[in-house]
A protein has these predicted regions:
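Extended, non-catalytic subsegments within catalytic or DNA/protein-binding/adaptor domains
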Residues: 1-164
Length: 164
């Protein structure tokens, strides 16, 4: 029945984008030892990643460079042929909110003895649950956020700063 309603054009309820101030609250709500979650959220936002892209990043897809990190997205919703694209994320001045530092810290801990595998070995649905959990801990209405909130927050923030 749900699929029929969508075919007939019922409007989907859009979730709220995570904007900078909310992102800061969410990051501050993450326990210090939850370095995976911090890296996931900061990389997801700063790279404008889809949930499916985040959970399909492998160790070999990441290259740390002097300016930050390059992440190979092998396949995405709009790249069905699998040509791939590279997302470059720079270092941020504020280390607490720097996605590159958060990712480095997480990789150094998780991959200390192995150099292969998925970076975030979770499902795309888990991404949404993680976002909701920390939105709630930050005092935000978690029902208004979902996995896409990182990507839409990135796009909204970029537009506010003049990106086209």
């Amino acid at each position: 029945l749900h699929g029929i309603k969508r075919t007939l054009g019922t409007r989907q309820k859009a979730k709220k984008p995570i904007l900078i101030n909310d992102l800061k609250l969410i990051i501050k709500a993450i326990d210090k030892e939850k370095i995976r979650d911090k890296a996931l959220i900061l990389i997801g936002f700063s790279g404008g990643f889809r949930r499916s892209e985040l959970v399909n990043i492998y160790y070999d897809d990441i290259e740390f460079v002097q300016e930050g990190v390059k992440i190979l997205v092998k396949r995405s919703k709009t790249d069905q042929s699998g040509e791939g694209s590279i997302k470059a994320i720079p270092y941020f001045d504020n280390q607490e909110f720097c996605p590159v530092i958060a990712l480095k810290n997480y990789i150094n801990k998780r991959f200390s003895n192995i150099n292969e595998g998925k970076i975030f070995d979770i499902s795309d649905k888990s991404v949404a649950l993680i976002i909701k959990r920390y939105a709630e801990r930050a005092g935000l209405d978690s029902s208004k956020y979902a996995g896409h909130s990182l990507r839409s927050g990135f796009a909204t923030t970029a537009a506010e700063f003049g990106a086209e």
